[in-house]
Amino acid sequence: MSAAECPALKPRPGAHKMPAMETDTIIIGNGPSAMILSFILHGHLPYYSMNRPHPDPLLHAKLKDNPELLDADVTGLTEHFHASRLSYSTQALPVNVLLDTLVRPSVDVDVGEGETRVEWRYVPEKAVPHLVFGNAPKAGGQWNDNLVFASWDIQTLSYASMLCLPGYSFAEHYRKVNGKDLPAFTRPTRREIMDYFSAYPEAVGIDDSFQNNETLSGITRTANGFFISSHNIHCRHLVLASGIFSHVLQPLPMLQPLRFLQPTPEIPLLVIGSGFSAADIIISAPENQKVLHIFKWDPEGHPSPLRSCHQRAYPEYAGVYRLMKRAALAAAPATHKRPGKPKRTTSSPFLESRAWDEVYEGLPNAQVIAVEIQSESAVVTFQLPDGNTIERTVRGLVYATGRRGSLGYLDKPLLSEVLGCPEGTEPSPIISGKTLRAKALEDLEVAKDVFIIGSLTGDSLIRFAYGSCVQTAGRLIRAHTGDDKSGCRTPSSSRPQSSYLRVMNGMEGHEIYHNSDDCHQLEKIDSEAKETPPTSLDGLWSWMMRFWKS
């Protein structure tokens, strides 16, 4: 991506006139993982707490005589996890699973506020000078974004205890803001979590390191570290925490004009997507708004992530999945429908909240083959799986098929080094959760003095961010204090590099995008992912704002 395509990549005006700065570490991104790492680098070190033994007696036995977690032997501590009676994730990096079970023991079977087995000791002499840069206006990173215009009052998939950062929990923030205790089993709204994250740096005293609403660019390797040309800063270490959710996948050119049409209840809003982002739009829409939903349906090969949502825990997402399933069954050829006893059907408050048969139409696996703009609406022609074509009149489009991240702030040689591109190949800055996964399995230091944390490791849930942050902090602290052992590289995984761990995409389950042709999509996005002018979606934005304020 060039500076002409994306103004954010242009050097900061007057950067050459700024006084040169030096610091040990630059963290790129101001989201949850950056905040966890900054908290540690300010001198708050994690130790295993023996006030109450961990539910896993073997893990407790391994840690009781060596409680310091910065230098934890991940391989030795996690090698028994696969045979444990406790529930340990087999998908996340072992270091992330280790810290998750210590911070939130047995959280998968008890989502209450269980007692943490991690105590944070303040050791100021271990602090590492660092700065945190993020282009989000407030701390929280992409949690400040609403790129598909869903309601801010949509609940997160994770419970509050799974979204907490060290030193200041969401429960403490809730009590401070509302003057009462947080109810058990709370799924906060996205607005509440955004407010919590923005308040976090000041609450724990790390706001002195945060430079929000700043975009870095032109980062190059030097003889002694790195130079950030956009801000005239030198540093010894880089930590990439920019995530994999900054760029929304763009619709085909023929669909682009639909985004400028303002929806009206009488004419369907076209929603394209099979996951949580598409569901958020359907849930957020006014009750009388008609919706035409285009989605992939392959329950045996690549099922929608909505399928895993239990009706009691996530009634709204389970309800949208039920609508999709009904549409898929209705569209299936008669020869594919299995005869049998009718199943007992259940309903839910969400499914009874509006006349779905009147406002929702789902077209599974339909393809757009033509678009004709007609004044304030458009006629879209779809090809169905059986080869037949149909036409529908629509107003407005939400294209919610996923997001990607970008490492465009690195210059090409450094980008190639980070990605491990063969010599002579052109590196693409657009990345997914799979891009650096193989490197993360081997080491979080993906290039000399360059580390990745958070969703760049392939584990995007906040609960799994602690591990990469603790391990990276240990390396940075040892290097700064002179205790670093030359050539010592701590693996983030106890498994062979050839082991396959499924990437856990999704910002707390949102914006999940499943595509088997990942490399092709990355190439396509690289040429299409541009900054969208704030006024380009006025129609849809004003429609959503009018609804939320009503």
Question: Predicted segments — roles?
Answer:
Residues 142-183:
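Flavin (FAD/FMN) cofactor-binding and adjacent substrate-gating region
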Residues 2-136, 142, 183-550:
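Flavin (primarily FAD) cofactor-binding/catalytic cores of flavoenzymes
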